[in-house]
């Protein structure tokens, strides 16, 4: 399967899970389509070959991302995209493809005109782009996307990043039923990335399949650090602001409670569920794009899990406890038992156990990435994990 096939798969389904920036004033956010799009074949998205007939304005209009927005704002965004393209060309890169605009700016598949190396360049004026550059400069780990370099053009910050074959969102669409060993290999890479980040006082805050990049199950990395929070005290929960994606956010983050690295564990649990079942987010509202409000999302989690009152945070000042515990009083499920949603899926017992632990309603009961990696299911995997097949074959 080629690059376009994977993208078309998800555009056709109309599944859009928008990330929420900590500064919700960007034009993309007012339009409801706010995806970070930096590796090849990011999903869901559109792409266009960089040829003499390519028209950024027509590209954006055809995707209707500016419906209901004043025309001058659309024109301003088109102008910024054009400015980014000029800056990239002046920096010595040939633009091969233009990806769908994201919350923080624009992304392009490029080739270094001197070395012929294929890369992805993210260009943006917003804080998230600068935040990502700051975070990535300090990180070196095989499961974390590596920053190759940065440059500026006028007021734009541009990140030079490696180009991966696809993201996990598209990969799951192409593969459908992954072997358990591949699922565990991918999840191991994600958990290793989280262990590394948390040990370095960083919370990602937007772990989801769209932000996990893959060449094959043994070559996987976590990227898109525009929502990252740092430095944090990994031993004490605090409220660092609201960010991420509603469909994959943890209950405490949705409730605006103090939080810590456990928010990433919840989101990684959603990713594991998606790999194990081939379904979109367990707590994504049917018929919607995931951009519903936080209150409805929390209610959905409680209802589908059958959350028991004893599974709520014990802190009496917790927003989650104060505002939502009443919804759980009719639950007949025993606290600590299998959540109700497990009755809908036939999951291998080890995968179900991991998912349930990672999706513990009370963040105190979610294992750390280090603890999860010590589970026996990961110990039997080859390390490094071999490439069983080419992505898209």
UniProtKB/Swiss-Prot annotation:
Its main location: host cell. Phosphorylated by ORF47; this phosphorylation regulates subsequent phosphorylation of proteins 24 and 27 by ORF66. Autophosphorylated. Its EC number is 2.7.11.1. SMART domains: S_TKc. It catalyses: L-seryl-[protein] + ATP = O-phospho-L-seryl-[protein] + ADP + H(+); L-threonyl-[protein] + ATP = O-phospho-L-threonyl-[protein] + ADP + H(+). Transmembrane segments: none annotated. It holds the Pfam family Pkinase. ATP binds at residues 99-107, 122. Residues 93-378 form the Protein kinase domain. Keywords: ATP-binding, Host cytoplasm, Host nucleus, Host-virus interaction, Inhibition of host adaptive immune response by virus, Inhibition of host MHC class I molecule presentation by virus, Kinase, Modulation of host cell apoptosis by virus, Modulation of host chromatin by virus, Nucleotide-binding, Serine/threonine-protein kinase, Transferase, Viral immunoevasion. GO terms for cellular component: host cell cytoplasm; host cell nucleus. The active site is at 206 (proton acceptor). This is Serine/threonine-protein kinase US3 homolog. It comes from Varicella-zoster virus (strain Dumas).
């Amino acid at each position: 399967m080629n690059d376009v096939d994977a993208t078309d798969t998800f555009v056709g389904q109309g599944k859009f899970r928008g990330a929420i920036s900590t500064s919700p004033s960007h034009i993309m956010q007012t339009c409801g389509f706010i995806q970070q799009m930096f590796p090849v074949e990011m999903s869901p998205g559109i792409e266009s070959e960089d040829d003499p007939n390519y028209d950024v304005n027509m590209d954006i209009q055809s995707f209707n991302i500016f419906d209901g927005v004043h025309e001058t704002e659309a024109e301003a965004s088109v102008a910024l995209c054009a400015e980014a393209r000029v800056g990239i060309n002046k920096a010595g890169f040939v633009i091969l493809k233009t990806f769908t605009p994201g919350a923080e700016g624009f992304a392009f598949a490029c080739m270094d005109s001197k070395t012929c190396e294929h890369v992805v360049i993210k260009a943006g004026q917003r804080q998230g782009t600068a935040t990502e550059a700051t975070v990535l400069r300090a990180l070196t780990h095989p499961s974390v996307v590596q920053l190759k370099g940065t440059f500026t053009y006028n007021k734009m910050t541009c990140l030079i990043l490696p180009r991966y074959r696809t993201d996990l969102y598209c990969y799951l669409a192409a593969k459908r039923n992954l072997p358990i060993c591949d699922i565990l290999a991918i999840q191991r890479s994600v958990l290793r990335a989280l262990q590394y980040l948390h040990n370095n006082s960083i919370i990602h805050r937007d772990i989801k399949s769209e932000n996990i990049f893959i060449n094959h199950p043994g070559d996987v990395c976590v990227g898109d650090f525009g929502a990252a929070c740092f430095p944090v005290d990994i031993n004490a929960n605090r409220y660092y602001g609201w960010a991420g994606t509603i469909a994959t956010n943890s209950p405490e983050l949705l409730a605006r409670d103090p939080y810590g690295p456990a928010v990433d564990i919840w989101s990684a649990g959603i990713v594991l569920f998606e790999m194990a079942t081939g379904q979109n987010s367990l707590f994504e509202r049917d018929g919607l794009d995931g951009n519903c409000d936080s209150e409805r999302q929390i209610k959905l989690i409680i209802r589908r899990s059958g959350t028991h009152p004893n599974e709520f945070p014990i802190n009496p000042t917790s927003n989650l406890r104060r505002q939502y515990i009443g919804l759980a009083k009719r639950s007949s499920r025993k606290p600590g038992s299998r959540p109700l949603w497990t009755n809908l899926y036939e999951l291998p017992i080890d995968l179900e156990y991991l998912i349930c632990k990672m999706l513990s309603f009370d963040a105190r009961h979610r294992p750390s990435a280090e603890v999860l990696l010590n589970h026996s299911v990961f110990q039997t995997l080859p390390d490094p994990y071999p490439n069983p097949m080419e992505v898209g074959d």
